[in-house]
C-alpha cells in the first residue's frame, strides 16, 4: 500500500524514516502511527490514527500508551513484546493481525511493532480498512 511521499506500512526502512521526519510528514499518511518512549509515554500520534480511533491528540500525547490510551494492547501479543525488546536490547520489527476493541466495534487491523535500543522511540503502526 503506497502512500504519500512513498511511505508504505510494509517498507523495510520505516523505523529509520520515522526518526528523521517531523509530525507534519506523518499526518499525511494513510495508516496510524503512535510513537512512545521507554516509559510508554506517547510522544507522536498522527492525524489519521486520531481520526479513525476517535481520540484527539490532547487525549493521547503525554499519556501512558498501554494503560491510558490503548489498554486493549496491554497484553502478551503487544506490550510484552516491547518489554522484552527493551529488556534484551533486541530489535523488534513484527507485523501481526489484531482486533481493536477499545471505544469501538471490533475492527480487524494489522499492527507493526517497532523498537530497538538505538531508537529514542518505539512505534505501533496500525493499518486499518479505510472508511467507505
Where are these regions (language model features)?
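Short, charged amphipathic alpha-helical "coupling" segments at sensory-output junctions
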Residues: 2-21
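Sensory/regulatory domains in signal-transduction proteins
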Residues: 31, 36-132
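PAS-family sensory domains
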Residues: 23-25
